[in-house]
Amino acid sequence: MTTVEAPTTKDQGPTTSSDQPSAPIKFGTDGWRAIIADGFTFENVRRVAGAIASYVLKHEDPSRGVIVGYDTRFGSPSFARAAAEVLAGAGIPVKLSSDYAPTPAISYSVKNTGAAGGVVITSSHNPWNWNGVKFKAKFGGSATPAIMKIIEQETAAGAMPRGEHAGIEEVDLKPAYVRAICDFADLDLIAKAGFKFAIDSMYGSGRGVIAEIFEQHGIDFVAIRQEVNPLFPDINPEPIQPHVRMLQETVIRERCHAGFATDGDADRIGAVAEDGSFVDSHKIFSVLLDWLLRRKQWPGEVVRAFNTTRMLDRIAAKHGRKVNECAIGHRIFALSA
């Protein structure tokens, strides 16, 4: 089943919480987020990790372990280590990313290795002073509302299970993810076309991933904002206007055929056309859906959020596919798909 959702700032709005132990921690459409050193503290990260550990112990096979990853935000590696220690201390084996990694790389690792779930320290596209926690279910996607309700309840109950320390193994999650992308897309065909691209990682955890893929296949490109900078100077790491202005200028100046930008944890993408104009997500999804159905011959129905373009309906109808409309939110998508 193919799922399509339009990214918006509104649907991923920050979820605040106090750092007081009694304050409730609420999960939004794709995780819990708060301001660093206010609601987002080591204490609260451990509270959430304890709740996730309790969920895994009660509802999943804990021997399958949990994948833990993180983005380039301030303190993310340390917060990830704290979460990993809580999970391992509960008797759950942990594979901790050895470096910054895109959220989709954690999702892929969960699904590919058969893990019980995944924890990502990230605040996605929010301003620099925010951070958060996402939980990926055993199928690799965002946890369903039912799962998140259990985790919220476990958080409120102060769950902090203890067991024999199961150990933390540091692993590089990116190579397998890069190989999967290379196997899925016809990159040799793109290379033969002679296109030149601009890549903007927006100082986020997508840094170097697309560049590595292009380098492996001899695709010409220029890259901007690849360095780690937790302050995300002059932008929110969200691939929409006005934050893609530097990418637009680069595409024109370097005479690129197109430009691509990924957000803070590289699970959203924006595009710029050859003339420097911004290509919105609705057009990206439409092109992608047509490619998936026509070239890749993906089976199943199409699920889209109600805020996405009706072009998707026309493309689905052309290929004889039924369209199901759902509410906004990655975890709603997980349930609908």
Residue ranges and their predicted role:
Residues T2-E5, D11-G13, S17-E85, G89-A90, ...:
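An N-terminal, well-structured beta->alpha segment
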Residues T3-V4, S22, K26, K192-E215, ...:
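A structured phosphate/pyrophosphate-recognition subdomain
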Residues P21-S22, N131-E254:
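Gly/Ser/Thr-enriched, mixed-charge loops and adjacent short helices
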Residues A37, F135-K138, G270-E274, A317:
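Short beta-strand-to-turn element immediately C-terminal to the catalytic PLP-Schiff-base lysine
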Residues S54, K58, P62-W130, C182, ...:
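N-terminal small/polar loop signature for handling phosphorylated ligands or for N-terminal nucleophile
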Residues S76-R81, M148, R207-A211, D313:
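Short, surface-exposed alpha-helical segments at coil->helix boundaries
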Residues S98, I150-R179, A273-A337:
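Proline/glycine-rich low-complexity loops and linkers
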